Amino acid sequence: MPCNRSRPSLYSLSYIKRGKTRNYLYPFWSPFAYYLYCYKYRITLREKMLPCCYKSITYKEQEDLTLRPHCCLPCSCLPCSCLQCSESLGGLQVGRSTAQEKDHSQLKELYSAGNLTVLSTDPLLHQDPVQLDFHFRLTPHSSAHWHGLLCDHRLFLDIPYQALDQGNRESLTATLEYVEEKTNVDSVFVNFQIDRKDRGALLRAFSYMGFEVVRPDHPALPPWDNVIFMVYPLERDLGHPGQ
């Protein structure tokens, strides 16, 4: 019997969820007591045709298009769009429930040596993207922060405000050394907004350090808009270091 039904229906809705969560590593009066987060979701209602042409079922797909790392409030309030959590980092493909978001909202100390402290939301063997925060102590009262996401042997780092300062360069060197020695990351990606005033200086500085510009349509990149990515490939032997 011929099928007279039209094509299956498809409806899609996107929305953004923003907020802040408590960082219990610091007292509530500390400027680092809270982290900002931003999630972008897409809900799809899809009608699926059954073998019988007169019946169909509708099921819901929920996809988390954008997972942005929690940025501490002092970083997000700096006068530079690249560090505002709501504008800078957006988008690794991952699905999470509300309960999982609560579990992942608290960063725990993963490593500490010298001036470098590494915080993580999940064990590094987890399959979903994991937030890694690198805090590098500059003075007794100040530190440089690199906020990033670890996903499938790739680490995505947000370039902090005044990244070309000497202290931030030292913090990046310490971060790269940790990533190479303590994780199974193959490539480190840094990103910054296209409209940054120091874009030219960032391109020159990171190129000098061994980073290369990545074309926007590269399959390894998340779908972030108006962002320039640069990659630093880590030279590995036959095996990856275990965590």
Curated annotation (Swiss-Prot):
Keyword presence, Secreted: no
GO biological process terms on file: negative regulation of polyamine transmembrane transport; negative regulation of stress fiber assembly; polyamine biosynthetic process; polyamine metabolic process; positive regulation of intracellular protein transport; positive regulation of protein catabolic process; viral translational frameshifting
Tissue: Testis specific. Expressed throughout the differentiation process from spermatids to spermatozoa in the inner part of the seminiferous tubules.
An annotated Gene Ontology molecular function: ankyrin repeat binding
Keywords linked to the UniProt accession: Cytoplasm, Nucleus, Phosphoprotein, Polyamine biosynthesis
Keyword Transmembrane helix attributed: no
InterPro entries, per database record: Acyl_CoA_acyltransferase, ODC_AZ, ODC_AZ_sf
Modified positions (Phosphoserine) in chain numbering: 6, 9, 12
Subcellular location: Nucleus; Cytoplasm
Cited PANTHER family: ORNITHINE DECARBOXYLASE ANTIZYME (PTHR10279), ORNITHINE DECARBOXYLASE ANTIZYME 3 (PTHR10279:SF9)
Complexes and interactors: Interacts with ODC1 and thereby sterically blocks ODC homodimerization. Interacts with AZIN2; this interaction disrupts the interaction between the antizyme and ODC1. Interacts with GGN.
The protein's role, per its UniProt record: Ornithine decarboxylase (ODC) antizyme protein that negatively regulates ODC activity and intracellular polyamine biosynthesis and uptake in response to increased intracellular polyamine levels. Binds to ODC monomers, inhibiting the assembly of the functional ODC homodimers. Does not target the ODC monomers for degradation, which allows a protein synthesis-independent restoration of ODC activity. Stabilizes AZIN2 by interfering with its ubiquitination. Involved in the translocation of AZNI2 from ER-Golgi intermediate compartment (ERGIC) to the cytosol.
Protein family: Belongs to the ODC antizyme family.
Descriptive protein name: Ornithine decarboxylase antizyme 3
Source organism of the structure: Mus musculus (Mouse)
